[in-house]
Amino acid sequence: MLSLAVFYFVFLGTEYLFDNRMALYTDPSGVVLAQSYILGVSVFGFLAYSLIEKWKSKSGNPTAFKAAGFFLPVPVIAGYVLLFAGTGYWVLLGSGCFLFLILGYLGSRTHYLAAQLLRGSRHPAKTVSVAYAVGLLLQFLNHNLLWGETVEGSFL
């Protein structure tokens, strides 16, 4: 369940960072609108997981998918760099949409694996809620023990 807690922490932390960065370039209603875009894109990533897994099993070439997974951190790091250092509404929105597409996919994968591990468990909801609470605790510690947006973001 540690993977769920880490996912919740990264997802919520990235959303918080995105909102703070967008607030530099738009008014509060613009931040809410941009947030709705990134959360909507994360739904596409979440739904894409099952389609990609089905496609992967039918393709007969798992090496290509492994290579894509191996190199995925490079554009993700670039997305975070743009989120930290990018200037302008559209740069931040683009990097945010990209990151949340990937986070949606990873969230779907994490929840699927957790569901597999919890199959037959007597208390799956309790386990997931504890993982969420741990993710929120990490978020609290990140915001209260680390100072500065760059340091907090680096912790993500």
Predicted regions and their residues:
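Helical-face signature of the major facilitator-like transporter fold
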Residues: 4, 92-104
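Glycine-rich segments within core transmembrane alpha-helices of 12-TM secondary carriers
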Residues: 107, 119-150
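Cytoplasmic membrane-interface "Motif A"-like loop-to-helix N-cap segments
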Residues: 53-72
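Symmetry-related core transmembrane helices of the 12-TM Major Facilitator Superfamily/SLC fold
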Residues: 152-156
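C-terminal ends and interior cores of transmembrane alpha-helices
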Residues: 68-87
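Intracellular juxtamembrane helix-capping segments at the cytosolic ends
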Residues: 103-119
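Central cavity-lining transmembrane alpha-helices of secondary-active solute carriers
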Residues: 32-56
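Pair of pore-lining "gating" transmembrane helices in MFS-fold secondary transporters
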Residues: 1-35
